Amino acid sequence: MLGSLSIVKKVNLHSIIQRHQFKMLLVSISVGIMSGLFIALVRLNLGMPGHKAFFWMTPVLIARLRGGCKIGTTAGGLFAALTTYSFGANLAGGVIGMPLIAVAGMILDWTVNHIEKNNISGWLLVLILGFAGIAANLVCLSKRMILPTGLDPHFILGVSGFWFRLCSYSFFGSLAGIIAAISVKLKINKQLYENN
């Protein structure tokens, strides 16, 4: 009799965890859709290569860090790309580049899963997510290289070329990771302060 009760408790705990993961997946997808709408409807025209990744990566990564869905960044990134494509914008370089948005999301999900598994916090969290953002956005740069149009030229302050593009993608990727990490770090610090 006692064995059957412990089995029921394990099943109930497992179903609760699954329900929570599903709810957080829906949150990540919703954040991805809102990010995609922002990118599609608000044309910033910054002219900086890789700047759109900042506007989808940061909110989706914050939702993943706060929500805990294991595939939240991947799902949010894909839905951001699908939303922008549906509204005529060009986040993922069209249908050809969408799988690489998923790869960028997988890099971020793997990194966050590693951070959660090893209880990494503090400034090391900020540093790791900054580098993960760089890696994810450089995957997006490789996406631009496989498109039929190739690397269209960008000229800002008389600077152009591959190295400028590489630095710009790295900057916006690291900025997204760092801002997401700091926002979560500030939230944790605020909760610790309120509990004491």
Question: What positions do the PLM features span?
Answer:
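Short helix-perturbing small/polar motifs within transmembrane alpha-helices
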Residues: 2-16, 24-31, 37, 98-142, ...
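Hydrophobic transmembrane alpha-helices
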Residues: 3-67, 71
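Juxtamembrane/transmembrane-helix boundary motifs in multi-pass membrane proteins
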Residues: 15, 19, 23, 48, ...
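Hydrophobic alpha-helical transmembrane segments
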Residues: 25-29, 58, 70-78, 95-99, ...
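Interfacial aromatic-anchored transmembrane helix boundaries in multi-pass membrane proteins
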Residues: 37-49, 80-110
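Alpha-helical transmembrane segments of integral membrane proteins, especially early/N-terminal helices
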Residues: 53-63, 93-95, 130-135
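Membrane-helix interface "capping/anchor" motifs
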Residues: 63-76, 115-120
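Membrane-embedded alpha-helical hairpins and interfacial helices in multi-pass inner-membrane proteins
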Residues: 118-196
